[in-house]
Amino acid sequence: EQVTQRGVNNLSNLINLGFDTLVISSEPQSWKKILRAGFLNFTNWAKASEQAIVASTPSIAIKYNIPLILHGENPGLQLGDMKTMGRNGYDGNNLRYMNTVAGGNLEWLLDEGISEENLISFRYPSIQEFEDSNIQIVYLGWFWKDWSIINNGMYSATNGLQVRTDIVNNTGDLTNVFSLDEDWVSLNQMIKYYKFGFGRASD
């Protein structure tokens, strides 16, 4: 219900380009309760979805014995989320401490009556699980000299990425390449601006 046709087309484009792709989603009724809980508890409907996105890669890596995870941007260096900083600029193993992931704490969802069974995709693996599986997250942006939202967006657009066409006054997205799979992000960034005084345009 939430994904845009643009998002569907971009996922199809990745598959057509030859990327192995896993699509993970939550049970729809629980998902609606989870969105509501995020909004009422944190004024951030996207909190849980960010938990699921960030948790999915190490969970899959552990399941399939993949020791190396490549992430794009370092949120500490690029977005100011300093709790994610690791031993050096490319170490991403502290991603669990990202503001919206908060160490993987799901108590707030359990308190809302969401069952553990319906929170499997939101559960971030423990430090012990990381160590037992020898997992290492590496930020590509540290090594990629011209890494930027604009450069990555331009490169991707030349390879089939569909970008936003709406004006920045409506979206707050100066580049038209942020969070393209859905349009609720504009509302979330507006609320973020009202809460903290900055949003997508000034991150």
Language model region names:
Residues 2-203:
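Nucleotide-activated chemistry modules centered on ATP-dependent adenylation/adenylyltransferase
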